[in-house]
Amino acid sequence: DLIANPEVKDTFVKRSQILKEIRAYLDEKGFLEVDTPILTPFEIGASARPFYTHHNTLNMDMVLRIETELYLKRLIVGGMDRVYEVGRIFRNEGMDPKHNPEFTTIELYQAFTDFHGMMDLVEELYKRLAQKICGSMVIPYQGKQIDMGHWERLTMIEAVKKYSGVDFNDWATDEDAIAAAKAHNVELPEVPTKGAILAEFFDAFVEDKLIQPTFIYDYPVEISPLAKRKPDDPAFTERFEYFIDCTEYG
């Protein structure tokens, strides 16, 4: 396949170049690259199903990690202000074009900033990658022109209103949110609170519209139990995710 299809080889080359540039960028910003354990004695972090193995010398069952988050956070607590890891993750779950049991993540943590500062860092990194790897801020991809030079920033409330016409602020009670969900054929979550229903509206009306780079922030606390709550509105959190071509990238 590599011999017959040059574009396949080009994918490998670009992946290597991207990782090199990410490391260079983060190193310039004062981040320290670290390696955290891949084999762990118990399941930690995300709710994904892990792969199990057995350590013969210690005679104990172990798991392959399903995330790098908790060990990196320990390093931050221990006094390392900026850390990142390029690491393999293993999840014993289904496969589709967006999911693989073994994949690479790039996870980073920085003390003494806020989520707006982290959004700035992510945007700057992607712009650098586009220019250095592709030679342009506009990248053709599957018939679309992705403009890495412009990133929209919307709260989840703003995004839902923009793409569905439904205004979260019109819901005074959970019952109002339930009625709105039924009127728009939106699936009700197991615990149908206003915030949880807002997230269902996002999934139903917004995510598949986010073709150009977009930050979504101010997530409801119901779906963000570990995120810092907003001081002025504890029903929402200082959390963001970003989407490109209808896909969440971080």
Positions of predicted regions on the chain:
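TRNA-binding/sensing appendages of the translation machinery
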Residues: 1-51
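Conserved short hydrophobic interaction patches
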Residues: 25, 125-132
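Short secondary-structure capping/junction motifs at helix and strand boundaries
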Residues: 29-36, 81-85, 134-135
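Short, glycine/acidic-rich hinge or "gate" loops at secondary-structure transitions
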Residues: 35-39, 134-145
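A translation/RNA-centric and nucleic-acid-associated enzymatic feature enriched
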Residues: 37-128, 146, 150-250
